[in-house]
């Protein structure tokens, strides 16, 4: 490609929380004159439809999904797997190495760079073999990735292999975070020295660290100390914070309603229900595209929502093929009738961006996934945290301890909350003594985030700097 239009291969990891922000970032790259090819497997192609309809110049590379004994036939996205499906999916996608190399070898004008998800570290080896650059796209924040990279590079071990509460300290990371072992990344906790699958995972993370640069969906004012730390840790300044990366047409109901799948309630009906509610009177409850509550967790959550007296929207994911369907995702039979009028239940996908931006929303009870975190902050909505795994415990600490826009509600993927305590927190989140303070702090972060992506803002400049870098590197590689 020419100097003004570098060609980049985008490779998203097939999970909604990973795909959607990278696809939104891809839209921004196209708007800045970058030529794009996106790599997906057949069943993930529909996720590209909104992007392709807006940007018909984007090319697609559709490669067959490799078979794997732990992934049911027909499943190509981790939304259809239980939480432990991440490891199998990461290993399985590594089988695409040779088909990708073949495609590059046969392309008349191949890409000069690969931008791939943080879980696809094997693409660094592909880029090195081809003599091009690989950039990590991180759908997690800088604090969380600092912890993850420290784990995989340093490989700390428990003193007592049976003590799940043993603290892991990270003294070199700003604010010296520490986490009990059970809160550490489950992918890291599953590591077995010499095991081919988990050794492959470790190699992927080390390849991330060795890649040419990292693009973060975060903003400087939210994670400045961690972004600075990572530049020192990596030994270079090729770290760009371009967030919050917003979806095109973020206020368009038709665009947002099916952005991540189908819903049991139309977006227009959800918004009409919210229109009938008072300002700052509704708690939105959602635990992301991956987590499915156990029936006992769901029972206690339902009791808490009932006892709290607050208006609410509950977005509840159903059990996937890998769950024991009788033990997960079942909403109590009494619940919906008892809370009719005061509560709205949405099964599977909910138009979260539209919900959070509505004037009626007072608080968000969340698993603290990074996309949910950013979507709440961009809407100026305080949070109730219930981290369950992955990067979520680090994100909760950032929200509660550092920015004071959240309060802790529960912790752990298997933890069953106390319904009385949770009911009190839900009520406090709507009309408690410190609600206004949290709302003001959240509103301040909202203004900072919005100004950052406007022309002249920090994230706007970071995006421009990254595109300039891609052009310069493409010129060098082509020469």
Describe the role of every protein-language-model region.
Residues 1-220, 224-479:
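Glycosyltransferase specificity loop/lid
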């Amino acid at each position: 490609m020419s100097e003004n239009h570098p060609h980049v291969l985008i490779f998203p990891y097939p999970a909604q929380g990973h795909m959607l922000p990278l696809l939104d970032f891809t839209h921004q790259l196209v708007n800045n004159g970058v030529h794009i090819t996106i790599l997906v497997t057949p069943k993930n192609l529909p996720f590209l439809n909104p992007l392709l309809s807006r940007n018909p110049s984007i090319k697609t590379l559709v490669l067959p999904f490799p078979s794997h004994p732990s992934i049911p036939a027909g499943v190509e996205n981790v939304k259809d797997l239980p939480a432990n499906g991440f490891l199998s999916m990461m290993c399985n996608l590594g089988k695409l190495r040779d088909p990708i190399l073949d495609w590059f070898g046969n392309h008349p004008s191949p890409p000069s760079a690969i931008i791939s998800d943080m879980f696809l570290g094997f693409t660094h080896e592909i880029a090195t073999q081809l003599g091009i650059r690989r950039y990590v796209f991180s759908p997690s924040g800088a604090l969380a990735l600092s912890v993850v990279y420290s784990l995989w590079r340093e490989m700390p071990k428990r003193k007592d292999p049976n003590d799940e509460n043993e603290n892991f300290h990270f003294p070199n990371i700003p604010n010296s975070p520490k986490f009990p072992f059970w809160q550490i990344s489950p992918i890291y906790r599953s590591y077995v020295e010499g095991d081919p699958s988990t050794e492959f995972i470790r190699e992927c993370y080390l390849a991330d660290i060795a890649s040419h640069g990292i693009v973060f969906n975060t903003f400087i004012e939210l994670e400045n100390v961690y972004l600075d730390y990572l530049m020192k840790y990596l030994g270079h300044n090729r770290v760009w914070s371009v967030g919050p990366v917003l979806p095109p047409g973020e206020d368009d109901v038709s665009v947002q309603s099916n952005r991540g799948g189908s819903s049991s309630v139309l977006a227009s009906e959800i918004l009409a229900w919210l229109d009938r509610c008072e300002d700052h009177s509704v708690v939105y409850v959602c635990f992301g595209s991956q987590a499915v509550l156990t029936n006992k967790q769901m029972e206690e959550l339902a009791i808490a929502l009932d006892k709290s007296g607050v208006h609410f929207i509950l977005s509840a994911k159903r059990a996937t093929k890998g769950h024991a369907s009788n033990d997960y995702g079942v909403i109590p039979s009494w619940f919906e009738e008892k809370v009719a009028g005061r509560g709205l239940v949405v099964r599977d996908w909910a138009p979260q961006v539209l919900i959070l931006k509505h004037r009626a929303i007072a608080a968000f009870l969340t698993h603290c996934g990074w996309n949910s975190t950013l979507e709440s902050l961009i809407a100026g909505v305080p949070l109730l945290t219930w981290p369950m795994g992955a990067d979520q415990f680090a994100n909760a600490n950032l929200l509660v301890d550092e920015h004071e826009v959240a309060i802790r509600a529960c912790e752990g993927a298997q933890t069953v909350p106390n319904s009385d305590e949770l009911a009190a927190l839900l009520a406090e989140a709507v009309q408690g003594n410190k609600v206004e303070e949290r709302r003001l702090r959240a509103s301040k972060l909202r203004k900072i985030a919005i100004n950052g992506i406007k022309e002249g803002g920090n994230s706007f400049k970071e995006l421009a700097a990254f595109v300039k870098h891609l052009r310069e590197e493409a010129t060098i590689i082509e020469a």
